[in-house]
Amino acid sequence: MKYTLTRIDPDAPVERYPQEQRQTVDDPLAQEATRGIMMGRLEEVLKDTVNWGRKNSLWPYNFGISCCYVEMCTAFTSPHDVARFGAEVIRASPRQADFMVIAGTPFIKMAPVIQRLYEQLLEPKWVISMGACANSGGMYDIYSVVQGVDKFLPVDVYIPGCPPRPEAFLQALMLLQDSIGKERRPLSWVVGDQGIYRPQMPAEKERKRGERINVTNLRTPDEI
């Protein structure tokens, strides 16, 4: 599996992903396994254990911009029970959260605020873009709206819809958990940048294309 190595570069010029450099590399564990089967296997078990704890205790930052935030809050009610995914502990400060959801329209005036809040998140941190406005600007193709938060933030999961249903938010959490379970982060006490290895997850549209092409009996909207 190919991985994307992300490194922090404070001196980098302002680009699409500020303060980050990305490159495609091979699985780092495969390289470590050549040193010895025992040590390679032990490191793999340790990484899987740490990732299991991270993906099952995701604390979201309580932050909303527009109407998609209402659907996000609905996912925290008892009919949907987001606590099943360990993401019910909403934090009022980004310094105590694991990920943030950009739920709403990212106006240009809000972009510096969103970026500042993202920088206050402690590593490891993730971003979910929720709704058409956050993904691509939606119907607001105007001067005052950023055409997608990925213009100034690294996004891990995109949720389509205007607005998305709460079930879509829960699916995004499961996709994020799947991605976190395959991440490779350094297991050492060294303070400083050592890089983050993230798997290249396929788009759901591409993953389900074959299944959708093979459908012969189309269901009506009330049956979906």
Curated annotation (Swiss-Prot):
Function, in words: NDH-1 shuttles electrons from NADH, via FMN and iron-sulfur (Fe-S) centers, to quinones in the respiratory chain. The immediate electron acceptor for the enzyme in this species is believed to be ubiquinone. Couples the redox reaction to proton translocation (for every two electrons transferred, four hydrogen ions are translocated across the cytoplasmic membrane), and thus conserves the redox energy in a proton gradient.
Lineage: Bacteria, Pseudomonadati, Pseudomonadota, Gammaproteobacteria, Alteromonadales
Family note: Belongs to the complex I 20 kDa subunit family.
Binding residue positions for [4Fe-4S] cluster: 67-68, 133, 162
Designated gene of the protein: nuoB
This protein's record includes keyword Transport: yes
Protein name as it appears in the record: NADH-quinone oxidoreductase subunit B
Regions of compositional bias (Basic and acidic residues) in chain numbering: 203-212
Record keyword Nucleotide-binding present: no
